[in-house]
Amino acid sequence: MLRLRKIEPSDLPFLYQWENDATMWADSDTHNPLSRHDLHQYIENTTGDIYRDGQLRLIIEDSQLLTLNSQLSTKVVGCIDLFDFDARNRKAAIGMYIAPEARGKGVGKQAVQLLLDYAFGFLHLRMVYAIISVHNTACSHIYEQMGFTPSSPLANWTLEGDAILWQKSHD
C-alpha cells in the first residue's frame, strides 16, 4: 500500500542520495550537488504548507504486511512534489523521483494519483502540469496514463534538448 507523507529528519539519507543523482538533473532545476547540511536545513525549514513554502514535497512510502509475524514493513521508495505554486491561478507543477529499485512497479502512477487527489480535492487546484524531457519516456508514459495532455513542445528547453508540457485540468 502506497502513501504520501511529510518529510522527516530521518529522510535525509534518501534525499541526499536522490538529489545528488546527476542522471536526474536533466529533468530538474538541480545544477550542482547538495550537501547534507543544505538538505538538513531544507527539512528543518519546510512547513508542509504549500501556501507558505510555495512548494510541497512529500515522501512516497510503500507498506507491506509481513505474513510471518503480521507486522507492517514500510520502505521509502521516492518523493513527489508540487512546486511553482500559483495560488491566484490555482495551479502548480508536479515532479517526482522514484528510487531505482521501485521503478517499473506502478509506484509513480499510484503516487501521481494520490497527489492529484490531494491537489484537486483538498487544495482545489484547477491545473497541475509537468515539463518532461522528450528523452524521459517512462515519466511521459505515466502522465499520459494519468490523463495529462501533452500541450506544448518546448524546443531546446534544456541543455539536453526538447521537453514537453503535460497538463491536467480539474473543473
Identify what each model region corresponds to:
Residues 12, 23-24, 48-51, 124:
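Generic structural signal for secondary-structure transition and capping sites
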Residues 1-41:
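A short, well-structured alpha-helix characteristic of acyl/acetyltransferase catalytic modules
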